[in-house]
């Protein structure tokens, strides 16, 4: 006997230890959902992009090699050639085949703020991607709510069916005694037993549904869900400012502002150093190369100021496009807030409706219980038949089921309102 008590206590402790709250399931589901990996990938991609942009300040080095054949080249006038020949000088002139192996180097000194703007755009794009991921991940909570409260409702229905089975079993035992005493017909006993077996069959179906839902919720959350805890009633305020979608819209608007600033950098001139060096023929000293066709080392160093006036052609249209894009984002935010407000109104009214209905549930159940007990007494005295008792048992169970549905639905609407407002 002592061992049985210890075993029972351990089972009860295990059951308590395995109880999960709605918040625990939501947190576990967010950690388990594959999309959460995108946070690290977005941060990594953004950092690499910024580093690549920053390398725009490094010297840009280009190595090249070329060989050309020209239809004509610079040559001495015939009079000059004859004069040199008379002096004993052989002026060969340039050859039509020319070769060059060289390196070009460019170093930006002032870029008009282009690199800084690109860096700001890359970081803001990363923030937009993170906000989008957060908004997508937030929807996990609603899916958890749906499965969690469906599971709670199934638990209540199974519990109520167990109560009905107990009532029917009690009536079945009483009728068995009455059949033996000759005060009840065997058909009455069979009727109650058939009803009990029917309820047991319904319970098995409900348990099968519960097992399936538990499995789905467990896989979704990444933890074993065996004993969901009924959450307490809460009151949520009417506000949508905390929703991650709002942060997404704000980051998208911020991105258009950064992009607009980047447009202005395209209108500014750039200043840079450059150097060219090559080994080939002909070199920079063309007169010497016309006399002796030898390869030589050559180099140029300078400073360059450039201004792309072509950016002026599209500047106005580019700004107009960004303005239209901002208006689209603002409109999407307005639509979201409108729909969010409609959901809040619906959920708030549903909570009020279920709360009002629950106020009458206790009285209805009390009345149905009294009627059922009276029916049991009447059956024992032969005043009513078994069908009347079964009807009252089902009526009482229906009243209790309605109360459970009203309570679970009210809690579901309360926590859906919390989801709508992100509280």
Residue ranges with predicted function:
Residues 195-223, 366-423:
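Short segments within alpha-helical structural elements
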Residues 37-41, 54, 109-137, 187, ...:
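Sec/SRP-type N-terminal targeting helices
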Residues 18-62, 66-72, 183-185, 221-259, ...:
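Bacterial Sec-pathway N-terminal export signals of envelope proteins
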Residues 64-104, 276-309:
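Small/polar, glycine/serine/threonine/aspartate-rich low-complexity segments that form flexible
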Residues 25, 32, 39, 108, ...:
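Amphipathic alpha-helical coiled-coil segments and their boundaries
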């Amino acid at each position: 006997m002592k061992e049985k008590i210890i075993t029972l206590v351990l089972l009860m402790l295990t059951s308590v230890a395995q109880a999960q709250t709605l918040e625990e399931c939501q947190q576990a589901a967010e950690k388990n959902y594959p999309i959460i990996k995108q946070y690290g990938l977005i941060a990594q991609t953004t950092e690499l992009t910024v580093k690549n942009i920053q390398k725009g300040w490094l010297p840009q080095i280009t190595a090249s090699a070329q060989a050309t054949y020209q239809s004509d080249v610079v040559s001495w006038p015939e009079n000059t050639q004859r004069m040199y020949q008379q002096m004993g000088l052989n002026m060969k002139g340039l050859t039509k085949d020319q070769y060059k192996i060289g390196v070009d180097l460019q170093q930006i000194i002032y870029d008009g703020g282009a690199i800084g703007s690109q860096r700001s755009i890359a970081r803001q794009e990363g923030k937009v991607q993170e906000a989008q991921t957060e908004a997508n991940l937030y929807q996990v909570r609603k899916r958890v709510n749906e499965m969690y409260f469906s599971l709670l409702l199934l638990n209540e229905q199974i519990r109520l069916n167990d109560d009905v089975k107990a009532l029917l079993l009690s009536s079945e035992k009483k009728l068995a005694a009455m059949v033996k005493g000759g005060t009840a017909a065997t058909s009455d006993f069979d009727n109650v037993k058939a009803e009990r077996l029917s309820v047991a069959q319904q319970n098995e179906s409900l348990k099968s549904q519960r097992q399936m839902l538990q499995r789905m919720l467990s896989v979704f959350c990444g933890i074993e869900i065996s004993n969901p805890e009924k959450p307490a009633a809460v009151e949520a305020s009417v506000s949508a400012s905390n929703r991650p979608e709002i942060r997404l819209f704000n980051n998208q608007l911020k991105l258009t502002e950064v992009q607009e600033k980047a447009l202005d950098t395209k209108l500014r001139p750039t200043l840079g150093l450059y150097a060219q060096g090559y080994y080939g023929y002909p070199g920079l000293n063309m007169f010497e190369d016309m006399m002796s066709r030898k390869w030589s080392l050559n180099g140029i160093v300078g400073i360059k100021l450039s201004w792309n006036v072509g950016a002026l052609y599209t500047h106005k249209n580019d700004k107009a496009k960004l303005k239209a894009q901002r208006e689209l984002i603002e409109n999407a935010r307005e639509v979201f807030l409108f729909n969010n407000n409609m959901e809040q109104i619906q959920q708030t009214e549903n909570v009020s409706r279920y709360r009002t209905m629950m106020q009458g549930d206790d009285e209805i159940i009390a009345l149905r219980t009294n009627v059922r007990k009276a029916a049991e007494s009447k059956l024992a005295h032969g005043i009513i038949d078994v069908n009347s008792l079964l009807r009252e048992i089902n009526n009482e169970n229906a009243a209790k089921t309605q109360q459970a549905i009203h309570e679970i639905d009210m809690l579901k609407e309360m926590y859906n309102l919390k989801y709508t407002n992100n509280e």
